Amino acid sequence: MKKLKLHGFNNLTKSLSFCIYDICYAKTAEERDGYIAYIDELYNANRLTEILSETCSIIGANILNIARQDYEPQGASVTILVSEEPIDPKLIDQTEHPGPLPETVVAHLDKSHICVHTYPESHPEGGLCTFRADIEVSTCGVISPLKALNYLIHQLESDIVTIDYRVRGFTRDVNGMKHFIDHEINSIQNFMSEDMKSLYDMVDVNVYQENIFHTKMLLKEFDLKHYMFHTKPEDLTETERQEITAALWKEMREIYYGRNISAV
């Protein structure tokens, strides 16, 4: 898309929001409590602050203030106030390609924010535990939140991801013509690296005329040992392994499709 010469500030709002899920099986009540404590510590307010501070760097935002909070019995959120750095619009990369990978939180850039909240969860029966992180990156001006997508998915090591991207409002060029989007996009998937896309089954539901884009991701490879907490698959009977695998896979599909699935 040809770069626009605008009249005044770019008034478009670009919002990227997604849910990231991590699934685990904990055999006993003690193991379930241990998993919740482990995941709560792994994604505490300090670590989330580090992740979102790097996110601000990736999208080109300048941090003004940070507020963070860990909750009892579990969960965390962080808030970062930021401003848009003095960037030459000619240097902003608006092309449709993946952002960088790494080697809650709210941020405010002029009229923009980044936020993340965590939700560890388990049920006393069945042994299934889930961890959900809700993240939203909303920006005004030339900054694109899509550049942080690759980094955030990689950092949070997700089994399931649901992503929404929307462009709202309009901006005017020097001739007074309204523009309701200032960059090309056919799919959120085009902002992910090839190695990232190879790991997931993905489906898009897009409403192009409304500048609304939606992508769902489900991890392709399933290895039971990666989903067990303090229990080795080889210590279980074949029947137990099959039952746990079926329960985990059902849980993941229900979250991915957003509906309860009857047992076969």
Curated annotation (Swiss-Prot):
GO terms for molecular function: adenosylmethionine decarboxylase activity. Binds 1 pyruvoyl group covalently per subunit. It catalyses: S-adenosyl-L-methionine + H(+) = S-adenosyl 3-(methylsulfanyl)propylamine + CO2. GO terms for cellular component: cytosol. Is synthesized initially as an inactive proenzyme. Formation of the active enzyme involves a self-maturation process in which the active site pyruvoyl group is generated from an internal serine residue via an autocatalytic post-translational modification. Two non-identical subunits are generated from the proenzyme in this reaction, and the pyruvate is formed at the N-terminus of the alpha chain, which is derived from the carboxyl end of the proenzyme. InterPro entries: AdoMetDC_fam_prok (IPR003826), S-AdoMet_deCO2ase_bac (IPR009165), S-AdoMet_deCO2ase_core (IPR016067). Catalyzes the decarboxylation of S-adenosylmethionine to S-adenosylmethioninamine (dcAdoMet), the propylamine donor required for the synthesis of the polyamines spermine and spermidine from the diamine putrescine. This is S-adenosylmethionine decarboxylase proenzyme. It comes from Salmonella typhimurium (strain LT2 / SGSC1412 / ATCC 700720).
